[in-house]
Amino acid sequence: MTVGRRKLGPMTVQSESDLSIVLGVDLDGVCADFYSRMREIAAEWFETNIDRLTPQVSYGLSEWGIKNQDQYESLHRFAVTQRDLFRTLRMIPGARKYLRKLSDEGFRIRIITHRLFIQFFHAAAVQQTIEWLDKNGIPYWDLCFMKDKDQIGADIYIEDSPENIVRLRSRGYLAICFGNSTNTTIGQPRATNWSGIYRIIHSKKDHMLDVRTPLAKRRS
């Protein structure tokens, strides 16, 4: 599901035939600090002191006592519908700065998120997501809500989900891991901050353009 397109700042209008490198950028855990905000909400949900909930979690939040998918979805539903989770997330430092730099340099920013996995609350999730992007000044060309991110057609993915990274890499895509406690087993390329992500993208830029140029010539 692609919601829309927009430009912020001096982003230039690009056609589908341009050689602009498309960055597939995840939101939660990459641009938005999902786990710190969810930790606050979980402390309220469980009626416990936040210090009892470790900030070092794995995917699924079992460290907080979440035992199955139903419990995870119940907490997530409460967070989205009663605490405006996606509207109140703090931005990960550097996300706006470096995405703007990349946008100004001609990279196409494609935000890709799987926030619609809980039924019946899609409208709230979409609205909160758009408002958060606007509030934090995150530049993007496309906003896509999808589970299977390899179908988006990005050249470089920035992702924190270990499952998504393994899937993307197994299919031949360049997936940069945004490191956190959920993905400690994922190897390079990875970085734990946006300055590191920016450097990796630029280290791969020439190779990506070399790969795409012959294809563009065949199309012309």
What are these regions (language model features)?
Residues R100-D104, D134, R169:
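Anion (oxyanion) recognition and catalysis
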Residues T2-Q71:
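Active-site neighborhood of HAD-like aspartate-dependent phosphohydrolases
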Residues L143-R169:
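Conserved Lys-Pro-Asp/Glu-containing loop-to-beta segment of HAD-superfamily phosphomonoesterases
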Residues T54-V57, R110-F120, V126-Q151:
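A short, structured active-site edge motif that brings together acidic residues
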Residues F86-M91, A95-V126:
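Substrate-recognition element of Asp-dependent hydrolases with the DxDx(T/V) motif
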Residues I50, G60-K97:
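Metal-dependent phosphoesterase signature
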